[in-house]
């Protein structure tokens, strides 16, 4: 037996049904040692659930029930034991319930027993993922160093790992180690070919996968250590890149998989690999078949660390706020962590375009080599030097994802989120917030001796009120406005008032238990009561508040470590701890939504309703107290967790920022005293000036220190909305800068008039008018500009725009069909520019500029539309454009009429000189 320490990269679980012997459940842990050895740990685990038995049963009756039930449902009788746990559903004074832990050899047996027993008995925790269960039982993190003790060589190897061992799950344990794991990261990309000069389709026999480029880099190292491009057909050398030429396409894919194996790849990354590259590779393997034997020439089973079973197709159809509607196509790589950077950016960043070129330019100041698809096709048909140009292009495409991975700390973001909630990294990629919050609750409930019941939900009718928004006193405030914000309001409310499913009073008999204090709140769903903890002893604290306490402490500690790492110049640890603290924050904020869901693991809508109702009361109380503490002050707005106060100060102190900061801090501190800890009303910023348009819509200069310059802060205006063109945002931003920084409205109006004139005179480049929308799968209404442009691109190039991609477009003038639907005037910006087309200036004035500009100046001018768009010069130019439109329309109608009557235009009888 031996002890080893590994850093896990993948967790797999399965019911194993051997040819001989009994079935069992196994968890396979893949990882790497500090010395760079690959490891596979086989560990058996017996899944279980809890079942509540009647309180009246004697020990003998319970034992008989255990024996009979174990025999009937193939449970492991020696491991099925009586236990006592508290029920995490409804306040009952912390009563211990009689329960039985039924243990099974396989998940299939567990599910069968649960299905048969659930109508007769209350089942607990049958839906807990066994892998997650092990994380909590052994207090280990899914993406952190773990100790594997008492391990012995595996009797039957299932992987190609350097080391393969077996051990009991009880011999897994945590290791306090933040050493950088020597993970090998492989960034890869494919290049494809179409003989017909159309978009390559894997099912077309001659649409080859012509090159696969891969760049290898060790995690934490500054530079890659190997760049290799496997090429179909002879390819000339490329400086700094290893070129491997193959005679057959199948050899390209087999060689690439062997390289991944030889390099002991731990993390596979790419850009759009889940929607294109992996699907294409799979499609080409179906075409690579031996004509004589009919056998596959490419063995996808060589992907990953298993001896067999790699390369299986995994299709996922996901619809979420983060991803939208998307279909993902993966080839399974057991033992290897897969990351598609495109999906990470879609989920975590709000961008105009998610192309690798745009993202790299934005975050790295770097770009791809420009090599259009048609040139790739031509160069593939050329000589070895031509194909080397493709290889250099492909290698560059694999460098950029590695740089983005490091720059954006993407690996740290995924692994630290996985560690914070104790779920595998794969769950972070493909599953929602529910599983994360549930895993956290499972762990905390176990610590506090609670069991989470299956199939519990609060039956509610109607909807509860959302967060409070105080009436907005619209206007332009050229005096300082103090912003008072509650720190982590919803998690703090839950902690302060002990809100949890097992502290919520659900039965009348527990409404007035002697010695128990209650918090009562009226909501849109009714009145709810929560048993409160003893502040001196902590007794009676709920599971959810206790969990949030822990997360708050963990976050505070992570921020402390992050600051230390920053002082020490340790960039790796700084990024690691920053990812940690952000993960804890996300989890804390997700618990409210987890409990408020109508469906899920343990939905408890009353808690969500109680939290928002309490938040409303706190916002209203803050507004009231601010005016009481500083008579003459005015609350001009209040949102979910913040209140804006125009403080009444002596005339000579109104514009004194030091005094404003001093009084705002005092005000926040005084009001905080009215609330139960840990609720904390903070003061962090002054807005000056502050233009309030309506609820959730404002523009201001934000000061976080009294002596700083301040930064523009905008919410809800067209300036920050992606459905407006750059010209709209640019004009609004430039106008706002003049209003906010110079406090000069007349000059802002003059500058805006000049910018509108330039639009009407077509003096701005076309990219300023470009918009983009995400292409989805299937539309009820097909009159969509981006769909129309996507269809045009396909007709012209043969290249379909993939679902999920953002399609750029501009609206152009169409003199031949001026009255067609606006969506049909949408055009591909590149095509429009190359063909000298002119943007539809009337459309941009009427639909992109008129309303946003008038809205911007509404609090500042009596009649913005009249003063700006009714200005003589602007009005005249707009009328001229409208007259041209009418003339074009008249001509177009005459031409259509003549065509319908089979008549020629008189102009057709004359020739141009």
Swiss-Prot record:
Reactions mediated catalytically: DNA(n) + a 2'-deoxyribonucleoside 5'-triphosphate = DNA(n+1) + diphosphate
Ranges for region Contains conserved residues essential for 3' -> 5' exonuclease activities: 182-401
One BP term from GO: base-excision repair, gap-filling
EC number: 2.7.7.7
Top EC class of this enzyme: transferase
Pfam families, A to Z: DNA_pol_B (PF00136), DNA_pol_B_exo1 (PF03104)
Listed name of the protein: DNA polymerase
Species per Swiss-Prot/TrEMBL record: Paramecium bursaria Chlorella virus 1 (PBCV-1)
């Amino acid at each position: 037996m031996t002890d080893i320490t590994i850093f896990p990269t993948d967790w797999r679980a399965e019911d194993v049904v051997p040819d001989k012997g009994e079935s069992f459940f196994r968890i396979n842990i893949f990882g790497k040692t500090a010395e760079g050895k690959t490891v596979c740990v086989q560990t058996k685990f017996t899944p279980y659930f809890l079942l509540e038995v009647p309180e009246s049963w004697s020990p003998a009756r319970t034992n008989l029930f255990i024996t009979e039930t174990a025999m009937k449902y193939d449970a492991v009788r020696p491991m099925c034991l009586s236990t006592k746990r508290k029920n995490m559903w409804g306040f009952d004074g912390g009563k211990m319930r009689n329960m039985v832990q039924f243990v099974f050899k396989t998940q299939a047996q567990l599910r069968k027993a649960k299905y048969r027993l659930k109508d007769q008995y209350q089942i607990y925790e049958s839906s807990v993922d066994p892998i997650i269960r092990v994380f909590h039982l052994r207090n280990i993190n899914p993406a952190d160093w773990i100790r594997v003790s008492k391990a012995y060589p595996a009797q039957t190897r299932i992987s190609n790992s350097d080391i393969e061992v077996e051990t009991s799950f009880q011999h897994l344990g945590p290791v306090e180690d933040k050493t950088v794991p020597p993970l090998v990261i492989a960034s890869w990309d494919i290049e494809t070919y179409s003989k017909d000069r159309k978009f390559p389709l894997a099912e077309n026999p001659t649409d080859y996968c012509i090159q696969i480029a891969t760049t290898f880099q060790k995690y934490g190292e500054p530079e890659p250590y190997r760049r290799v491009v496997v090429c179909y057909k002879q390819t000339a050398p490329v400086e700094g890149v290893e070129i491997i030429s193959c005679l057959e396409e199948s050899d390209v894919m087999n060689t690439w998989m062997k390289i991944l194996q030889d390099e002991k790849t731990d993390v596979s990354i790419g850009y759009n690999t889940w929607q294109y590259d992996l699907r294409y590779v799979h499609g080409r393997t179906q075409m690579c078949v031996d004509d004589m034997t009919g056998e596959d020439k490419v063995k996808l089973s060589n992907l990953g660390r298993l001896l067999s079973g790699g390369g299986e197709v995994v299709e996922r159809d996901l619809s979420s706020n983060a991803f939208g509607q998307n279909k993902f196509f993966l080839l399974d790589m057991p033992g290897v962590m897969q990351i598609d950077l495109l999906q990470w950016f879609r989920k975590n960043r709000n961008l105009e375009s998610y192309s690798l070129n745009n993202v790299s330019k934005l975050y790295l100041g770097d770009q791809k080599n420009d090599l259009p698809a048609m040139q790739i096709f031509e160069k593939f048909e050329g000589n070895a030097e031509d194909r080397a140009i493709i290889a250099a292009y492909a290698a560059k495409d694999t460098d950029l994802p590695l740089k983005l991975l490091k720059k954006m700390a993407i690996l740290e973001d995924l692994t630290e989120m996985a560690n914070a909630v104790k779920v595998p990294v794969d769950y972070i990629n493909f599953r929602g917030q529910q599983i994360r919050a549930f895993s956290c609750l499972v762990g905390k409930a176990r610590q506090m001796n609670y069991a989470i019941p299956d199939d519990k939900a609060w039956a509610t009718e109607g909807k509860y009120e959302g967060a409070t928004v105080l009436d907005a006193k619209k206007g332009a405030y050229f005096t300082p406005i103090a912003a008072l914000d509650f720190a982590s309001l919803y998690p703090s409310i839950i902690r302060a008032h002990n809100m949890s499913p097992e502290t919520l009073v659900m039965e009348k008999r527990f409404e007035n238990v002697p010695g128990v204090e209650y918090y009562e709140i009226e909501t849109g769903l009714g009145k709810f009561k929560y048993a409160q903890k003893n502040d001196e002893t902590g007794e009676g604290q709920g599971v959810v508040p206790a969990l949030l306490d822990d997360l708050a402490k963990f976050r505070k500690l992570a921020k402390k470590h992050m600051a230390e790492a920053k002082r020490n110049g340790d960039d790796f640890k700084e990024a690691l701890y920053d990812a940690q603290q952000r993960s804890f924050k996300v989890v804390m904020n997700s618990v409210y939504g987890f409990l408020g869901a109508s469906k899920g693991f343990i939905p408890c809508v009353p808690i969500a309703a109680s939290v928002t109702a309490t938040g409303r009361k706190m916002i209203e109380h803050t507004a009231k107290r601010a005016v009481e503490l500083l008579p003459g002050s005015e609350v001009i707005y209040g949102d979910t967790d913040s209140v804006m106060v125009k403080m009444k100060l002596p005339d000579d102190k109104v514009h004194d920022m030091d005094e404003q900061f001093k009084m705002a801090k005092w005000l926040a501190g005084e009001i905080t005293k009215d609330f139960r800890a840990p609720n904390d009303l903070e003061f962090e910023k002054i807005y000056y000036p502050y233009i309030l348009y309506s609820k959730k819509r404002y523009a201001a200069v934000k000061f976080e220190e009294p002596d700083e310059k301040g930064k523009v802060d905008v919410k809800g205006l067209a300036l920050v909305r992606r459905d407006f063109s750059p010209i709209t945002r640019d004009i609004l931003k430039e106008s706002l800068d003049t209003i906010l920084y110079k406090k000069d409205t007349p000059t802002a109006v003059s500058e805006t008039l000049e910018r509108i004139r330039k639009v009407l005179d077509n003096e701005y480049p076309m990219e300023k008018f470009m918009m983009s929308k995400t292409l989805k799968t299937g539309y009820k209404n097909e009159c969509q500009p981006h769909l129309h442009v996507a269809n045009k691109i396909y007709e012209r190039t043969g290249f379909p725009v993939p679902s999920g991609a953002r399609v750029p477009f501009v609206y152009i003038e169409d003199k031949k069909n001026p009255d067609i639907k606006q969506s049909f005037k949408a055009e591909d910006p590149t095509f429009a520019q190359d063909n000298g087309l002119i943007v539809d200036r009337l459309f941009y004035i009427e639909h992109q500029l008129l309303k946003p500009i008038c809205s911007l100046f509404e609090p500042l001018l009596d009649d913005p539309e009249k003063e700006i768009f009714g200005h003589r010069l602007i009005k005249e130019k707009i009328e001229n454009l409208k007259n041209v439109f009418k003339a074009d329309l008249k001509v177009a109608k005459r031409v259509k009429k003549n065509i319908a009557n089979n008549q020629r235009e008189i102009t057709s009888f004359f020739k141009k000189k």
